[in-house]
UniProtKB/Swiss-Prot annotation:
Active-site residues annotated for this sequence: C748
GO biological process: cellular response to phosphate starvation; phosphate ion homeostasis; phosphate ion transport; protein ubiquitination; regulation of phosphate transmembrane transport
Annotated spans, Disordered: 1-23, 485-509
UniProt subunit comment: Interacts with PHO1. Interacts with NLA.
Protein name: Probable ubiquitin-conjugating enzyme E2 24
Source lineage: Eukaryota, Viridiplantae, Streptophyta, Embryophyta, Tracheophyta
Biased composition (Polar residues): 495-509
Species, as recorded: Arabidopsis thaliana (Mouse-ear cress)
Catalytic activity entry: S-ubiquitinyl-[E1 ubiquitin-activating enzyme]-L-cysteine + [E2 ubiquitin-conjugating enzyme]-L-cysteine = [E1 ubiquitin-activating enzyme]-L-cysteine + S-ubiquitinyl-[E2 ubiquitin-conjugating enzyme]-L-cysteine
Amino acid sequence: MEMSLTDSDWDSSSDSGSSEHEEVEFSYGGRAQNIFSNLEETIGKIDEFLSFERGFMYGDIVRSATEPSGQSGRVINIDMFVNLESTHGKIMKEVDTKRLQKLRSISLSDYVINGPWVGRVDKIVERVSVTLDDGTNYEVLVDGQDKLVAIPPNLLEDSQYSYYPGQRVQVKLAHAPRSTTWLCGTWRGTQVMGTVCTVEAGLVYVDWVASIVMEGDRNLTAPQALQNPESLTLLPCVSHASWQLGDWCILPGSSHCDIAERQTPNVAAYNLNECHKTFQKGFNRNMQNSGLDELFVITKTKMKVAVMWQDGSCSLGVDSQQLLPVGAVNAHDFWPEQFVVEKETCNSKKWGVVKAVNAKEQTVKVQWTIQVEKEATGCVDEVMEEIVSAYELLEHPDFGFCFSDVVVKLLPEGKFDPNADTIVATEAKHLLTESDYSGAYFLSSIGVVTGFKNGSVKVKWANGSTSKVAPCEIWKMERSEYSNSSTVSSEGSVQDLSQKISQSDEASSNHQETGLVKLYSVGESCNENIPECSSFFLPKAAIGFITNLASSLFGYQGSTSVISSHSRCNDSEDQSDSEVLVQETAESYDNSETNSGEVDMTTTMVNIPIEGKGINKTLDSTLLENSRNQVRFRQFDMVNDCSDHHFLSSDKGLAQSQVTKSWVKKVQQEWSNLEANLPNTIYVRVCEERMDLLRAALVGAPGTPYHDGLFFFDIMLPPQYPHEPPMVHYHSGGMRLNPNLYESGRVCLSLLNTWSGSGTEVWNAGSSSILQLLLSFQALVLNEKPYFNEAGYDKQLGRAEGEKNSVSYNENAFLITCKSMISMLRKPPKHFEMLVKDHFTHRAQHVLAACKAYMEGVPVGSSANLQGNSTTNSTGFKIMLSKLYPKLLEAFSEIGVDCVQEIGPES
């Protein structure tokens, strides 16, 4: 309802507003206008502060914001500019961050060098220089004893900087302690107020990470954790690109004439000035002649970057707002100057550097370097260029350098051989123990990667020099290797060391070593062989068994079957959810069979008494003749020999003393459930001698990149089963074809408690079963779009970047499935030899037809539709498939498949 104001109402309102304005004017003593104008300006400043400015680091992978599904690139250079505001409200704009300095020369997490050792700064004890109000100057080592107490307001609410230049402090010292150095005047107890002039690192706690050690002295003792900063050398870093909003800094050489004064200072500056008035009288006369650099806070950032795109082109001065970060890097994406090797070969003398990448066609132009032995000249490097498929490349395992990596220069080969004759070894030892070797040599041998150029690595060394080296001349220090060095925290240790520092300007530290320079870690490396996320690495986490996600996933992909996590195997529930999925899976598979001459996949049931003694063990791996006079492999059976089972010798296996009646009964129930409800695409063998061991074979479902493949799993039931989930090992053959299935055989699934989960996602002793587990493998793990199984990747569903990566993942998954077929035919798992031969005898023609269809452009997983777009599949995929096709023909021919009429697809 609208309200209209009469003239009298308006006059009354105006009078009221006028009186209120006068009241405010009176209350604020004539400063109301100034405050209100400052308030408006402050709101504008807050909006500016909260404005989003996208930032990047060296080596980040990015895409163009205007073409998110296009090629990606790598950030190779950064220019950063910031707006600064001093504590007095004065501002500077568009300041290059290369001019900025931190409040201390050493900060937490910085890498430092002491002789051959590299460490990371873990804690800092500050040395503060204070000027008292009467002009007396002194330094104090602040070791947590409240020798200096900050007087409010404290401008820096940052735990990393307890003190900063210009800060007012109260000195709480009854006498001049050992850690105090008087620069001017003498100590008098009445001098308690002062101003901080400089703040530096007085003592540093270092966590020693690694060392360059000699071959004969692996027990080299690490330096003490508590160090004098003068004995340390700071490792170079690209700190100019790491500044953020709100960071405090110092601008060397800044003067009042360089600073633009605001016409009307903002509220924050006004308040700070009011607070500073309490100590300006004593501080100003010192500031005028002290030449102290003024303290600034960063209020705005702006970044320009240079990007090296996959096709080899370079864009300079790109505004960061025009780029998007690539959160999930495709495993088959490569970038110029990246070092690679061929997947299928183990030739350590052949490595390549990427020159250009066609992201759409998945092809890579590689410059190969091959070491060739020649009698006349010895070892010679031969260089050649080749365009290859991205699917046949891997990042070089030893040359995976990234920006800011800490690297060590290795001695030239043959410089020192511990097995050489005594004369040579003695000469080398004499060389390595010279005094300059323990000092300058290490500073010129430890550095940080700053770039890549023409197959070389650009390194900035600790001595300040920069050079380009071949990747084989340096070794990367893994930052995940941290030591458990003891941290000296006692007050006495700090005081003792500070006394030594005051007595001597330099700390002597001589380490004499002999032998070949190597990288040596103090601590133990991580047990999990999962590398840290960088610009070159694909993230290695795998998603768990997420039922709700699976439902939406299959709904999106057009699947007709949905698994229920509440599967029951009790006798009272004849029509369980598991049985429904079995029936649907079997129908889906049977409906996909188009060849009338193929095997009838109707399940043949074998009756097993509850005790498990009624199985005819003589029929192990026998073939049953069906109505078409064809033979097939039993779905479920018992075997005697399980000598090649992965868990046979496991220390977590079942001891005879641990066998209980309840456990045996539960296992027999599992056997009965498997016998009665296995779909015709799953085969299981249990071991008579070891009831806790099973082996299962799964057939890849139609419509997935795993179609027609065979996938084997070894299963062990722990003594606590079913209160603990079974242990599972996947027969990978050293290949990774799914985010949940690792090359090592590890299966990452929340249902197995090998991945995080909750509720129905995890193992339930009352409802979960082996059958449910196998169905989960087949329906949820080996699914239509396995790319989205990766943890967090479900957020990319429906997005251009995610769908593009999913297509690439499916192409590679099918290629690996074909490789696993070849491997399985030549070395099938025990007791499944006949299954492997029988399966591929009847499915070989279908596999070969699918390969031809994919070569013609049919999307992977939909080979039934022979009308495909020739541009659907990438050229890199077709290159690899054309190489695999003859190998498939050969492998199928070896088991008696007639492949004479099959003609390999054109490259």
